[in-house]
């Protein structure tokens, strides 16, 4: 977002952050004086105005994004929309700590290139046939997106997928239509599978955790890590198979012969990674332990003498 704001400033000559800063303040001050629309309470109108004010500041980056997020913590108590305790609890609830812990673990996986090794080992084992290569990239992308952000997964996998696509474009055996179909299927499959993987675990994407918090707060029913996976994983696997089949057999059928150069690209990436470092091994062990606690806490708790595990505590422990 920041780069887009800078780009708009350069082409327009306007100071976008200053305009957003003043625009958000002026808009909110004027809107506060208006009567709420029919069917909306006064408090509801105030919350809506504050939300729009924050949206203006976020889009223009009038102040740092994190600072804008703290606006309700200041204004809600002043406008009697909630106490500092009730508002502040939303900034430090279980959902927030689960997101934080999962994010830190994901950063560690990226920091030591564990995600690259997992992806390359997965793709290497599917062979060199085009349809299998697409499936391998989709499987690796979906698995990684279960634990790190969809964007990080796609950014990491994209250059490798492009290398494979360009290799088959230039040296693969097949007509131009099949070569184009392979590249299209590979790129779309990579993107779709990252989104699908993100829905398979609670920490796959932040919206999952936000839904968990909202559901528990409003309906009093707790969703733990295993509960989510019992629904998300079967749906995710089904969607992966459907998307792979639609891309490779229906929308962009690819009639090509595999190219041994694909294996060489993957081997080169693995060679670049070298042997697993101590830090990478430790990260893998922490990841496996944390995921095991999330999934198997129901089996472990009876042996803990009354101690209770929760997903947020496990996430912080792993972090």
Language model features by range: what are they?
Residues 1-98, 217-219, 227-319:
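Hydrophobic transmembrane alpha-helices of multi-pass small-molecule transporters
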Residues 171-253, 257:
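Membrane-core helix-loop-helix motifs of multi-pass transport proteins
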Residues 55-63, 140-150, 191-203:
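Transmembrane alpha-helix interface/packing and boundary motifs in multi-pass membrane proteins
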Residues 69-73, 151-166, 187, 200-217, ...:
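Re-entrant/interfacial helical elements at transmembrane boundaries that shape
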Residues 10, 123-128, 179, 189, ...:
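Membrane-interface segments at loop-to-transmembrane junctions
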């Amino acid at each position: 977002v920041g780069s887009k704001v800078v780009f708009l400033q350069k082409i327009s000559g306007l100071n976008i952050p200053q305009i957003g800063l003043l625009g958000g303040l002026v808009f909110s001050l004027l809107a506060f004086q208006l009567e709420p629309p029919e069917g909306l309470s006064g408090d509801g109108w105030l919350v809506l105005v504050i939300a729009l004010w924050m949206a203006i500041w976020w889009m223009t980056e009038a102040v740092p994004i994190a600072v804008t997020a703290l606006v309700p913590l200041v204004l809600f108590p002043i406008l009697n929309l909630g106490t500092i305790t009730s508002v502040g609890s939303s900034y430090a609830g279980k959902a927030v700590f689960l997101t934080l812990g999962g994010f830190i673990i994901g950063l560690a996986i990226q920091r030591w290139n564990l995600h690259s090794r997992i992806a390359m080992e997965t793709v290497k084992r599917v062979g060199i046939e085009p349809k299998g290569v697409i499936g391998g990239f989709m499987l690796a992308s979906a698995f990684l997106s279960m634990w790190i952000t969809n964007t990080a997964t796609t950014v990491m996998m994209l250059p490798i997928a492009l290398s494979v696509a360009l290799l088959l474009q230039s040296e693969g055996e097949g007509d131009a239509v099949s070569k184009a179909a392979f590249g299209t299927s590979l790129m779309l499959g990579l993107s779709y599978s990252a989104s699908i993987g993100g829905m398979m675990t609670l920490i796959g994407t932040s919206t999952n955790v936000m839904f968990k918090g909202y559901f528990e707060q409003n309906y009093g029913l707790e969703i733990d890590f295993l509960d989510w996976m019992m629904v998300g994983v079967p749906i995710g696997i089904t969607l992966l198979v459907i998307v792979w089949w639609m891309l490779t057999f229906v929308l962009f059928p690819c009639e090509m012969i595999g190219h041994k150069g694909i294996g060489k690209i993957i081997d080169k990436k693995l060679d670049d990674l070298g042997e697993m470092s101590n830090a990478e091994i430790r990260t893998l062990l922490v990841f496996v332990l944390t995921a095991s606690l999330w999934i198997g806490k129901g089996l472990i708790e009876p042996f803990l003498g009354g101690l209770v595990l929760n997903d947020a505590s496990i996430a912080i422990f792993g972090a």
